[in-house]
A protein has these predicted regions:
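Polysaccharide-binding and catalytic clefts of secreted carbohydrate-active enzymes
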Residues: 135-266, 271, 289
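Active-site clefts of carbohydrate-active enzymes
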Residues: 105-109, 205-221, 291-327, 348-367, ...
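A conserved amphipathic helix/loop scaffold
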Residues: 324, 456-661
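Catalytic-core region of carbohydrate-active enzymes that cleave or remodel glycosidic bonds
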Residues: 124-125, 234-249, 266-352, 369, ...
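Aromatic- and carboxylate-lined catalytic core of secreted/periplasmic carbohydrate-active enzymes
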Residues: 333-413, 421-434, 499, 503-528, ...
């Protein structure tokens, strides 16, 4: 089991991952306390017969029963894992094994990631387990499932312990050796930063803290401190694994919080061998889930996906089993857009769970009857072998969306997240232009897109801004929507003026505006929250979209944060206008109209073009398109809220593999 820059491989051949999570149908997460190889053999045999090609497992509870107080695992623990791995090997199933869940605080210490004593015990546990199995070729290690940085799970808040406080101050001293300058950045009196600097308070994470005398400018620094500290922990654990002689894959299994405000693959991705996302709740942003988790030059896996039970107020399920399966189909299909596939959570439903949205999750019920999603997984598994032989050398799309962490790691994060999501949908669903995402701290790995879009950034670090301008200097085209006149501490920067434009930022305090695209006028409307917090740009000549040469490239600058206007079509029209100006066209032509809720996303491979199609529409859609690269036509009926995949061979100029039609 290995990875290249984009996909998983087994024995050097690409692997389209269609897997599941498995512990035990009998005792679920207590499978190390009550191991039953007879049941494992039966269940894994069923998973194998379903055609699935990877399983994820590990420890979510009960660590005190696996090892002593120093982290040394008991012999029975290692023998249990050996039996499990041998059973998986019998059925040819690669295994991802997870060590910790949420917070590795089970081995003591005052801080799970920063306390040297705690980290040492974690290393002891991991080292002993990996040493025993370092030569198992089909095994990968997951350091921790869905990590949070502190005991305040699923948030980015300080733990508040002395070790964290000391580490925070050490980090600040290295990053900002001049306390007077730091005080200016945070807009506080210099004397308030004398001595030990406190951790941010809860009020500082509120956008309204300034009304009670507490500004939020330290939040960005605290989040960066947490990101870098966790990335260092992941590097330490990966190095511990490598010391054993293991060359097995190492990862972190993060959920959607990682691409929002928690520990992000944009930071810890360089510490592991592939990145992950767990696509659970963001059902309207399934594509964004994948694009934001994918890091340049590194494979990405939707390592958990499934169906949280959605309930009405009267505790009755909102979705039928068939509708749930259709949603899962869209998630699995979309996982092959710039991703390696998906692992479903979970094969056997866990009736031991107490939360009503967790208990029913899984393909096989406790009475061993199957949900429709089990059939769905079998169908994807049958398709995977014909897909994976084509998963080689994917070309990046010509358009990159650069996301602003300066905004995302502020108390106004919701605006930047919404701008990203709406930019992805406007480009891919409406303008029919495929794109990829690059986070602000990864800007040096941007690549060579023909167009970079900065969607409603409001703020950007000086380093990232310089990199974007350099990209334009060397011949790239940049589209900015709204101002980018603030840095990560919300200090004013005169970036438009520095580019030779007569312009300034001003508060966006109106509901209606117009954007002029050539001879057309696009109406925009901004809601209450946008009027309360956002800025727009004002050009002295009154224009609303400027086009200007810069170096060898060009800049298009719209004065409004278009992605955050109420009507998404306005962003799509702006994107199409700029793309047309620089001769970027959709990679397929529409032979018949497509509903706005249908995604068609092509990826050019070395020998083929991979098309993923997903419907968010309430009506069936007649897909009738022609691929521009091969001239091949695709014509079929896509059922409402379902997905389909087609592989068009470059030599054959026809569909050579398909799913869903």
């Amino acid at each position: 089991l290995s990875v290249n820059h984009d996909y998983f491989e087994t024995d050097g051949h690409p692997l389209a991952v269609v897997g599941t999570t498995y512990m035990s149908s009998e005792v679920q997460r207590l499978f190390f306390e009550h191991p039953n190889v007879f049941m494992w053999n039966q269940d894994l045999g069923q998973i194998h017969d379903a055609g699935l090609n990877m399983i994820r497992t590990g420890w979510w509870t009960g660590w005190d029963k696996f090892c002593d107080e120093n982290g040394q695992p008991y012999e029975r623990t290692l023998r249990t894992l050996e039996a499990y791995l041998m059973t998986a090997r019998k059925y040819g199933l690669p295994v991802q094994f997870n060590f910790f869940a949420f917070l590795p605080d089970v081995l003591g210490g005052n801080n799970a990631f920063l306390d040297p004593a705690a980290v040492r015990r974690q290393q002891t546990l991991i080292s002993a387990v990996v040493s025993r199995f370092h030569d198992v070729p089909f095994l990968a290690w997951d350091l921790i499932n869905e990590p949070s940085f502190s005991q305040h799970l699923w948030t980015m808040r300080p733990n508040g312990d002395p070790i964290e406080l000391a580490a925070w101050n050490e980090w600040l001293d290295k990053r900002y050796p001049d306390r007077v300058k730091l005080a200016a950045m945070w807009n506080v009196p210099p004397q308030s930063l004398a001595g030990t600097i406190s951790l941010p308070s809860e009020m500082e994470f509120s956008p309204r803290g300034m009304y009670v005398g507490v500004n939020s400018l330290r939040v960005n620094d605290y989040i960066l401190f947490a990101q870098e500290s966790f990335a260092q922990w992941a590097r330490t654990m990966r190095a511990t694994i490598r010391v054993t002689g293991s060359q097995q894959l190492v990862t972190v299994g993060q959920d959607e919080g990682g691409i929002q405000d928690r520990l992000s693959p944009a930071f810890w991705g360089s510490s592991v061998d592939f990145t992950t996302n767990h696509s659970w709740w963001q059902n309207d942003y399934i594509l964004w889930d994948s694009l934001a988790a994918k890091q340049p030059g590194e494979a990405m896996l939707i390592q958990e996906t499934g169906l949280q039970r959605e309930l009405n107020l009267n505790e009755i399920a909102r979705r039928t089993p068939e509708n749930e399966a259709a949603l899962l189909e869209r998630k699995v299909a979309t996982s092959f857009i710039q991703g390696s596939g998906a692992i479903e959570w979970l094969w056997n439903t866990n009736s031991d769970m107490t939360e009503s949205n967790e208990t029913p999750i899984g393909a096989v019920r406790t009475d061993y009857t199957e949900k429709p999603e089990a059939t769905l997984l079998r169908e994807f598994a049958r398709f995977a072998p014909s897909l994976q032989e084509h998963l080689r050398d994917p070309q990046l799309p010509p358009i990159a969306i650069v996301t602003s962490q300066a905004s995302q790691y502020s108390v106004l994060a919701d605006f930047q997240l919404e701008a990203q999501r709406r930019a992805v949908r406007a480009l891919t669903y409406l303008a029919r232009l495929p794109a990829y995402l690059v986070a602000e701290n990864q800007i040096q790995r941007l690549g060579n897109p023909r167009l970079v879009i900065l969607p409603s950034p409001q703020a950007l670090s000086d380093t990232a801004w310089a990199a974007v301008v350099k990209y334009v200097d060397t011949g790239g085209t940049l589209l900015i929507t709204g101002p980018v006149e603030r840095d990560e501490h919300w200090q004013i920067r005169h970036r438009a003026v520095e580019l030779g434009l007569k312009a300034h930022a001003e508060p966006l305090v109106y509901h209606n505006a117009e954007l002029k695209l050539g001879e057309r006028r696009i109406s925009l409307a901004f809601g209450q929250q946008q009027q309360s917090w956002l800025d727009s740009l004002h050009f002295d000549d009154g224009s609303t979209l400027r086009e200007m040469p810069h170096g060898k490239g060009r800049i298009y600058w719209a004065v409004y944060p278009v992605e955050l206007a109420e009507e998404l079509q306005s962003a799509a029209e702006l994107y199409s206008y700029v793309a047309t100006r620089i001769d970027i066209a959709p990679p397929f032509s529409l032979l018949a109209p497509l509903p706005a809720g249908v995604l068609v996303f092509p990826t050019v491979m070395s020998d083929s073009v991979l098309y993923v199609m997903s419907s968010d529409s309430d009506e069936d859609a007649a897909i009738n398109i022609r691929d521009q690269a091969t001239g091949a036509a695709l014509a079929f009926r896509l059922p409402a809220q379902h997905a389909a995949i087609a592989v068009i061979g470059k030599k054959e100029r026809r569909v050579v593999a398909k799913y869903g039609f």
